[in-house]
């Protein structure tokens, strides 16, 4: 009744590279992405393929540089953060910004009606050509807290 539209979005990859060459992302979601695609096809629901795009993104950045898109920070980067953070699942601001661009590209590829609301200066994004991490600027909030909602 409210005019909403269902869109499936496959999960982002985790940063888990193969042990031998550290060049290929390994699957960590099992059958889940394929199950999503099957349900979407059966129900005629559009699917944004973050699963494939984030694999390309991580593999393009490579084993070491891909850490720059995730919550990988040495101890004492933030107040009250006494231990190093090495989270291969959750994106930092740079990574989240890149993933947001992937979502927009997915919407464009599907030609979803919402794309008409994109800014006129939007520039298309290719996860095989990510933005330079060293050029990315995100100013931390003065009210930052590294405590997880369920505690640390």
Specify the residue positions occupied by each region the protein language model found.
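Substrate-gating cap/lid alpha-helix
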Residues: 14-53
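Structural recognition of the beta-strand scaffold that forms the well-ordered cores
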Residues: 4-10, 46-49, 90
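Solvent-exposed loop/turn segments at secondary-structure junctions
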Residues: 5, 12-17, 52-57, 105
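Long, non-globular segments of proteins
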Residues: 8, 34, 106-110
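Conserved catalytic region of serine esterases and O-acyltransferases that act on ester linkages
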Residues: 63-152
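Short, conserved helix/loop micro-motifs enriched in His/Cys and acidic residues
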Residues: 12-19, 77-81
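Second-shell loop/turn segments in exported
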Residues: 1, 19-27, 84-94
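Short, solvent-exposed beta-strand-terminating loops
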Residues: 48, 52-65
């Amino acid at each position: 009744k409210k005019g909403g539209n269902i869109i499936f979005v496959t999960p982002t990859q985790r940063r888990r590279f193969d042990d031998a060459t550290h060049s290929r992302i390994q699957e960590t979601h099992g059958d889940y992405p394929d199950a999503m695609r099957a349900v979407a096809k059966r129900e005629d629901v559009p699917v944004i393929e973050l699963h494939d795009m984030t694999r390309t993104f991580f593999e393009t950045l490579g084993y070491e540089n891909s850490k720059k898109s995730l919550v990988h920070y040495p101890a004492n980067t933030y107040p009250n953060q006494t231990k190093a953070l090495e989270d291969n699942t959750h994106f930092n601001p740079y990574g989240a910004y890149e993933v947001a661009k992937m979502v927009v590209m997915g919407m464009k590829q599907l030609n979803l009606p919402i794309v008409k609301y994109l800014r006129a200066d939007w520039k298309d994004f290719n996860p095989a050509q990510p933005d330079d991490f060293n050029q990315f600027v995100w100013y931390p909030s003065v009210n930052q807290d590294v405590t997880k909602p369920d505690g640390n």
